[in-house]
């Protein structure tokens, strides 16, 4: 859809001028070129390219035609801040304009999309970013507008971002070429303020502008801007110089104390912004810093104060200014050199948009030049490592060299800028420091050449005879080198000069050595502690360079923190806080090996104490001791606690008794043993009533060593003695038999552990209902091959499993086998209502709410399945199934299945196999590489072909994609790629 049809050219011009006056409030256009560009866009017969300086009125060239058109104009802009500034300006003019970006709320986004779905949308201009234009969420809206023929124009603002030869290249702008191809019926308008001939050609090619293109370009010369360069090396007080410049540019203050304008000072780093704002404020210029390190609210407040002219000067990084439209900026100063001529021209062009005289100053320093040059080359090196060398890489260096030439060479500043952008030399009329006083600039450059910082650029003699006192032995020419022997005959005069030179050098050497002798570092002597020093091991010199005074200071910090903690917690009982502080300090001293580690540990403890005080809790000395890594005794674990990793000696089964000490034997009565076993029985029953199974059911699934903990851990957990002889018959109850079996290392225990591992892989053990049963009598022997899991509750569990059909025999007769891989457990399915053992192990310590009736859950677990089950298989088939599972795990460990593939796993595999193609340059940009990897990962996560892994499918799809395609140039390339079908 083009612009609204007009009967005659006169009618078109009349409507344009009427809208210009009625909506924008202008009687006429700012320049004839602006009027010509606007009329060309309104006509809609060809694509338009507009290149005008900042403040020349580029936005009006597309905003006015958009209001006259009957459809919607899509405007692509690089920054949300710039978009918001344009939207606010148009809303103030009562223009129906909207922005679709990530900062919209859900309600605002819903209202905007519903308006775009109308037959006649109210929105006239829709601002989006290039990322939004390429996003999948925007495509349905775009397709709807295209299908209904509701698009009037496609506008690309800041079009120089599309060129790799430009100073602000953005890869997302390259995707706009595909968008332009889809909207071939709508005229395209490209606008920029800085465009060299090379950049202009790139814009035409990348945006697929139809030839011939109506090009409107204004010369870059702005007569109201005065350019000058100041050399930091030649200024005694550079901060004072900047203050004088600010006050002169701002002019006289009004009666209320406010200035008639404002100014911007650009710095390269955040630290420089903060420092410069402080220096200017201390010298009488109200200035505030603005950079990305500030909070969003602080940045907004500083910007608003500057816009309202409460703060006349803002010191900012280069990120500030693109989204700000302020006409009365009287000066722009660059504290450091910019990265390119185009960037400097764009930033300095933010001054004087109202057409009044304004000043642009650059503070130049050789040190800044070297730093920026190093950063540019470093960035190029990183890019070249990823994508190789490109011809556009030279453009970055050439753009920076052009700005260096602008500062260092003698000549008109405006002429240097015009030469860079391909314009004819303008009539400066004393609009720069050189044209105003050429002799002064020439004198400054000569002084700069003679300054110390510039003499280092070339190693040469500073004296007539070639001797340079700053170089070793006067330098090559001063020393003479091989030239002495080339002369054939050295006279007595040469020998005399050599002798004098040698004496001078000896005197210089002796003088330097005498100076160095006085600067030898003094060895610090250790100051012994006082007699009343409260520190433990105060005279110890375990930590080098740690003084007693420093330890006493740390002790006071700990003591003060403990006192404040007792006060905050409201503790009433008296405690020797100094003794506690001494203990904490000594513990930290004993564990640290360096001074900085010691101080860091003390500060960490102080922070922990303050945190406890803030929470109103009394600081626990024992917990603090454990947290800092000191040796502490392990507390007695309960039956539901999994031993920590430090208690498990190895993941492999070990022969108990070969290297572990049994510990001292202590006497314990039978009454204590029976009471302890009774308390251990009640805990699993309470857990069953609360809707959670004891972790003992599933410990064997995770690790076979869980059934056989460390001997030292067993002794503390059981709390019973270990006799060297055989246990008495009275102790063979349900609780004591298990404890005695775990307490001694024998072949019987190894067989029990093997059976437990084998039993843990069988699904039928999860169908058993755990019920309380009386302890076995002493006369009933316990089967040596029984599983510990079933042996704990030998009553109803054994009977129910036996009723399913000779499964008990399987448990008792199967021989030991290798432990299956953990990955095979993930693929096992569990009965309905029964949680996965792995998940149960992870969540066994987490409290759960009550989940219904336990009897009803038991019925759900015992519900028969309509599919074939392991319960109906015979013994041989069960063993065969187990062997096949082991073989599969041994051949393909941890291989992803089709049903269990997650998006993250698929993404890792896709990126791993797609990266070589990216390094070969098969993707035009990194964003395309990310987009294709995301698309392929979603395809693989949704479905897989039967019998194929994620790796195989990924390789197949990548090979299919690059079969007839040399490079991936747009997202449209993979739209036809389909995922695997089942």
UniProtKB/Swiss-Prot annotation:
SMART domains: DEXDc, HELICc. Zn(2+) binds at residues 412, 428, 432, 435. This is ATP-dependent DNA helicase Q5. Residues 653-726 are annotated as: Interaction with RAD51. Its EC number is 5.6.2.4. DNA helicase that plays an important role in DNA replication, transcription and repair. Binds to the RNA polymerase II subunit POLR2A during transcription elongation and suppresses transcription-associated genomic instability. Also associates with POLR1A and enforces the stability of ribosomal DNA arrays. Plays an important role in mitotic chromosome separation after cross-over events and cell cycle progress. Mechanistically, removes RAD51 filaments protecting stalled replication forks at common fragile sites and stimulates MUS81-EME1 endonuclease leading to mitotic DNA synthesis. It comes from the Eukaryota. Residues 675-797, 812-893 are annotated as: Disordered. A motif (DEAH box) lies at residues 157-160. It is an enzyme of class 5 (isomerase). Monomer. Interacts with TOP2A, TOP3A and TOP3B. Interacts with RNA polymerase II subunit POLR2A. Identified in a complex with the RNA polymerase II core bound to DNA. Interacts with RAD51. Interacts with WRN; this interaction stimulates WRN helicase activity on DNA fork duplexes. Interacts with MUS1; this interaction promotes MUS81-dependent mitotic DNA synthesis. It is found in: Nucleus, Nucleoplasm. GO terms for molecular function: ATP binding; ATP hydrolysis activity; DNA binding; DNA helicase activity; metal ion binding; RNA polymerase II complex binding. Binds a Zn(2+) ion per subunit. The modification Phosphoserine is found at residues 489, 492, 728. It comes from Mus musculus (Mouse). One of its GO terms (biological process) is DNA repair. Coiled coil: none annotated.
